[in-house]
Amino acid sequence: METFRIHFFKEKSRHVDIDLLLNYFRDEPHVETEMDETSVRFKYEHPTIFLGYQYTITPRSTVPDIYRLSPNYLDVNIHIDLPILMNRYVFQQFLKSMDRFCKAFKLHPYHPLFEDVMPFKYELLSVVYHMVQSKYIQKHHEEMQSYVFLDEKVAYKMFKYEDDILELKSYYQDVSVFVPKYQLLYDGVQLIKAIEIIDGIQTVIPPEIDTIFIRLKDQSLFAYDYQKIEKKVAPLLTKVPGTIEGTHVVLKKVSNKFYKIVKKAPIKSIDTAFKSIRSRQILEREGSNDIS
């Protein structure tokens, strides 16, 4: 897969303190450092969404057509590569990280679609990224068969929940509340947004799910249509503080009643055409073709 590359420049200087740079990335969570005779690489991967980026320091410039750019800005031989197929939620998180990096070392970003080296601007970077992404999607139909396009608001809630999972697990660890990940199943047309839980446990219920897999004591597993009973169980759910709207928890005092209602919902038959996908295969697109 292609990447979206941003180069970094500095005004009237090429100097970047390497020790400060190494310490900067050493203090960044989930970043690994690699180096050899060709480059130094700082690799980040989101711990629950599994999308990442890579900063690279090279011995010489890799900027195309550098001589057409303003001489007031000098290439510091650092660039970042981002996945070209990335949802807007994670892209915005990565932009915030890039903004911090630019401010820390007084850098200015550049992409070949820019007129010149520019100050960091969220809107400009977002417009150019999504322009490049759109062209990539149009050209790679076969690759896109494994991706799902969701309504932007639905996708935002799902990614915000996944982004919060580790904090939720820490918040609930002392009271034995299970924090499930999404189980996503896709057959090329329909997306099933599910969770799998054990019968009777206290659990968080993420936003936007339509199916609950319940594993019974005999280890059998049933898929229940959550949408059919969502309104019935709503009074039993407690809103989880400090996270995205639609995130609730089933507490012990109501768990028996909750599971009785869920197990009266229609049982879904999941066709073998459905395959498991990860949330990183979800993209947002406005319009009538979106899956809600």
Predicted segments, located by residue:
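Short, extreme N-terminal segment that most often corresponds to the first beta-strand
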Residues: M1-F50, V148-L150, V154-Y161, N289-S292
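Secondary-structure junction/capping motif
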Residues: H15-L20, E123, D225, F258, ...
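Short, intrinsically disordered low-complexity segments
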Residues: N23-R88, I214, Q219-P235, K239
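Surface-exposed polar/charged interaction patches
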Residues: D27-V31, A104, S134, L168-Y171, ...
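Internal, hydrophobic cores of structured domains that mediate oligomerization or house catalytic pockets
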Residues: E37-R41, P71-K169
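Amphipathic alpha-helical protein-interaction segments
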Residues: Q93-R100, A104-P119, Y186, K193-L221, ...
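Aromatic/basic-lined ligand-recognition segments
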Residues: E123-K228
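Extended, charged low-complexity segments
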Residues: Q227-S292
